[in-house]
Swiss-Prot record:
Main subcellular localisation: nucleus
The species this protein was found in: Homo sapiens (Human)
Organism placement in taxonomy: Eukaryota, Metazoa, Chordata, Craniata, Vertebrata
Family annotation (SUPFAM superfamilies): ARID-like
Protein name: AT-rich interactive domain-containing protein 3C
Function: Transcription factor involved in monocyte-to-macrophage differentiation. Forms a complex with NPM1 to translocate to the nucleus, acting as a transcription factor that promotes the expression of the genes involved in macrophage differentiation, such as STAT3, STAT1 and JUNB.
InterPro entries referenced in this protein's UniProt entry, alphabetically: ARI3A/B/C, ARID_dom, ARID_dom_sf, REKLES_domain
Annotated localization: Nucleus
Key word Endoplasmic reticulum present: no
């Protein structure tokens, strides 16, 4: 008994020290069903068991107290850091931790306009309630995009739809002090405005609707395609546009071939010329149409072939004078017949086609042609049709070239 009291006194003197020696006393306790079994026997053994149980309870209490002290010490250390961390404190306790001004400080400090803060707070609050919050500061040209100034500039010009229709994005770019060398500045500004500001414009100003915005974007896209098409000259020919009085179908495109059922002038061609009378600047279209031209169309009289065209141009002016006057006002026409070309412009061969149009028996396969209009020289090659001439038109045809056989074969 005295030995146990000495051990107890030694434990109390050590303070928290008895934590280690108390551990070996715990394992032998589980076999005991209850502490009442220790009180059943009367005598020294019962007193010893009761004292050991009391010692164990005291050790547990001391351990709990030590753990509570350690937790209090840990809480006292990060106490200064607690208010600064937004995750450990609810937003309601520290509202300044979650203001838009601190999250988007760069936007609020762009200038000292007193209405800037009010506008940005209202904008961010509206986007938050709408379900599309602004999560980052918009950047353009490596600098912060001023949403306040952009909204004021666009709404001052009538809203986003009006700016798109009038194409005044360059003025908006200058108003934002952005570099003028930005590529596709209009598209970038329109995209940023639609993402951050257009819903707010519809809510506060009601200058347009999403349907009108989509229609303006589609119209702008179609106009861009049309400008790209008209900016490319056909066949690379330079010259002023044709006069309004002339048929627009008389452009540089090749005329359609004549039909087989009509022996007269081609009715499908808007210029009134048969397909074989068109002088093409490139030989490829003629080669493609050789197989589709019937033989009777090759020997048509020039008067029938060129009559409608002479009536269209000017009945009171000669063809040569008309061709000279056509230079400064009309562009060159690939389908112009050779008889309308001014004299002196065909260096290799110059003759009027007063008889039937027949190049098959003349022995000439091609004619080089040069035409100067407004100081620009256009050159091309005319290819002949190599088909046999019908016998019925023999008397009206020019004399055939000498035969390739021996000279004695053509003597009487």
């Amino acid at each position: 008994m005295e030995a146990l009291q000495k051990q107890q006194a030694a434990r109390l003197a050590q303070g928290v020290g008895p934590l280690a020696p108390a551990c070996p006393l715990l394992p032998p306790q589980p076999p005991l069903p209850d502490h009442r079994t220790l009180q059943a026997p009367e005598g020294a053994l019962g007193n010893v068991g009761a004292e050991e149980e009391e010692d164990a309870e005291e050790d547990e209490e001391k351990r709990e107290e030590a753990g509570a002290e350690e937790e209090a010490a840990e809480e006292s250390r990060p106490g200064a850091q607690g208010p600064s961390s937004p995750s450990s404190q609810p937003p309601g306790l520290h509202p300044h931790e979650w203001t838009y001004e601190e999250q988007f400080k760069q936007l609020y400090e762009l200038d000292a306009d007193p209405k800037r803060k009010e506008f940005l707070d209202d904008l961010f609050s509206f986007m938050q309630k709408r379900g599309t919050p602004v999560n980052r500061v918009p950047i353009m040209a490596k600098q912060v995009l001023d949403l306040y100034a952009l909204f004021r500039l666009v709404t001052a010009k009538g809203g986003l739809v009006e700016v798109i229709n009038r194409k005044v994005w360059r003025e908006v770019t200058r108003g934002l002090s952005l570099p003028t060398t930005i590529t596709s500045a209009a598209f970038t500004l329109r995209t940023q405005y639609m993402k951050y500001l257009y819903p707010y414009e519809c809510e506060t100003r009601a200058l347009s609707s999403p349907g009108e915005l989509q229609a303006a974007i589609d119209s702008n896209r179609r106009e861009g395609r049309r400008q790209a098409y008209t900016a490319t000259p056909l066949f690379g020919l330079a010259g002023p546009p044709p006069r309004g009085a002339q048929d627009p179908a008389l452009g540089p495109g090749p005329a359609p071939p004549a039909t087989q059922s009509s022996p007269g002038p081609a009715q499908g061609s808007t210029s009134g010329l048969p397909a074989h009378a068109c002088a093409q600047l490139s030989p490829s279209p003629i080669k493609k149409e050789e197989s589709g031209i019937p033989n009777p169309c090759l020997a048509l009289p020039v008067g029938l072939a060129l009559g409608p065209t002479r009536e269209k141009l000017a009945p009171e002016e000669p063809p040569e004078k008309r061709a000279v006057l056509m230079g400064p006002m009309d562009p060159p026409r690939p389908c112009m017949p050779p008889s309308f070309l001014p004299r002196g412009k065909v260096p290799l061969r110059e003759e009027r086609l007063d008889g039937p149009l027949n190049l098959a028996g003349s022995g000439i396969s091609s004619i080089n042609m040069a035409l100067e209009i407004n100081g620009v020289v256009y050159t091309g090659v005319l290819f002949a049709r190599r088909q046999p001439v019908p016998a019925s038109q023999g008397p009206t045809n020019p004399a055939p070239p000498p035969s390739t056989g021996p000279p004695s074969s053509i003597l009487p």
